[in-house]
Amino acid sequence: RAIIYYMRQYPDRFHHPREDVAFNRLVTHDQTLQLTCARRIQEHAVIAAAGEELLSCLDRIIAGVVIERSTLEAAAATYLIYYRHHLAAEERELIPRAVELLTAADWKAVSAIPTEPDPLFGTDSDERYRELRQQIAIMAEEAE
């Protein structure tokens, strides 16, 4: 639950709005990216909705409500598939073009979007994520 809560609280609320600005600015430099950028921006809303559904399933389970396993599995699969596809598409199609085309003024516009420190990985990380952060560090060490 902590991972999904984090994903709903930070990337969906602070990171994606900044990407939306960057993608809109990118289109001003290369009109051929219009459809790709529009899709990635739309995916932000779809990912948020899928994350909310998964979080709702997890909250019901924690509250003792019995739900079908297939319901939870479908919600988790939907969220993960959308998110993985979205990240891969951004990294493949847009990040290289953004590095190439966006100007200092564009990045300033992106930076103007309000944000908060990352509660999981930031210097002032949120206490509720301490155990999660430790688990991620252990998994990273084991993967090496």
Give residue spans per PLM region.
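Small-residue-biased structural context
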Residues: 1-144
